[in-house]
Amino acid sequence: MLKMGVVLFVFLVLFPLATLQLDADQPVERYAENKQLVSPYERRQIILHALGQRQCCDWQWCDGACDCCA
């Protein structure tokens, strides 16, 4: 009888709770899909801003003092 109670608890309480948590991921996925439409230049600017780098040097003139973006 105890085993049946545990099985019922798992399927009636824990399983629905686990499936409801999956719904919370949808806004993040939708945001990621919208970000795929950003041009490569805009994407690079977003990444550089997040990393704290404001300017890119030309790869031909790059020395050890700058971070190249190309």
UniProtKB/Swiss-Prot annotation:
- Supply one GO CC term from the record: extracellular region
Signal peptide residue numbers: 1-24
Q: Can you tell me which family this protein belongs to?
A: Belongs to the conotoxin M superfamily.
Q: What is this protein called?
A: Conotoxin TsMLKM-011
Keywords, ordered alphabetically: Disulfide bond, Secreted, Signal, Toxin
Top-rank taxon: Eukaryota
Domain writeup: The cysteine framework is III (CC-C-C-CC).
Output the InterPro entries linked to this UniProt entry: Conotoxin
Q: Name the species this protein comes from.
A: Conus tessulatus
* Compartments, as annotated in UniProt: Secreted
- The answer, when asked if Ribosomal protein is one of the entry's keywords, is no
Which sequence ranges are marked TM in the entry?
A: none
Tissue specificity is:
Expressed by the venom duct.
Presence of the UniProt keyword Transmembrane helix in the record: no
* MF terms in GO: ion channel inhibitor activity; toxin activity
- Disulfide linkages recorded for this protein, renumbered to the chain, are 56-66, 57-68, 62-69
Q: Which residues form the propeptide?
A: 25-54
